[in-house]
Swiss-Prot record:
Single Gene Ontology MF annotation: RNA polymerase II cis-regulatory region sequence-specific DNA binding
Subcellular location: Nucleus
GO cellular component, one term: nucleus
Gene: AP1
Protein name per UniProt: Agamous-like MADS-box protein AP1
UniProt lineage: Eukaryota, Viridiplantae, Streptophyta, Embryophyta, Tracheophyta
Tissue specificity as recorded in UniProt: Expressed in tendrils and flowers.
Function per UniProt: Probable transcription factor involved in flower development.
Main subcellular location: nucleus
Amino acid sequence: MGRGRVQLKRIENKINRQVTFSKRRTGLLKKAHEISVLCDAEVALIVFSTKGKLFEYSTDSCMEKILDRYERYSYAERQLTATDPESQGNWSLEYSKLKAKIELLQRSQRHFLGEDLDSLSLKELQNLEQQLDTALKHIRSRKNQLMYESISELQRKEKAMQEQNNMLAKEIKEKEKTVAQQTHWEQQNHGLNTSSFLLPQQLPCLNMGGTYQGEAHGARRNELDLTLEPIYPSHLGCFTT
């Protein structure tokens, strides 16, 4: 006689219920992971215990992405099946869904900030660590890219300034050379004019000076002759007597 199907019902014993929940939860998360890997399916699993503790699993840790996809799909289905304006949405249900989504996002944010980690299992902590490592890699990559771009821009500006300085130095050197040549030419022209002005000229006074001295000597001699003429006979008279 075959074994009959066991009727499922709530376990009354609290300890047994907690043990069964722990075992079935582990198996459920494992099955969700297996179907995600084997069938390449996007799986999102959310479980709340009787104490309100959250347990979740999502393919590649993309719970928000899967929930967004679910919301879009559900909205499209409701739009297709709606027959009148009154059946287009239950605002109360929408509010509950949005509230649950906000709570999930806030909880994920606290986890990323290192808060409320006591409720996470080892697998969930490993997934969180992997997400943080991936985020850090992206942040470091972006930071290095910005630093490289900044260094490249500074090098480009430095090269442009160096080229400009070289051009200015060349212009200054050419101007100094021109000024030096002009100064040299002016000095040469000034030296030629000064030399021609200072050359001695032959003056007639030199010859005239010699004539003047000869004439003066002759005149003085004549005076002496005139002076000696009256004296000479007297001397002669003395000698005769």
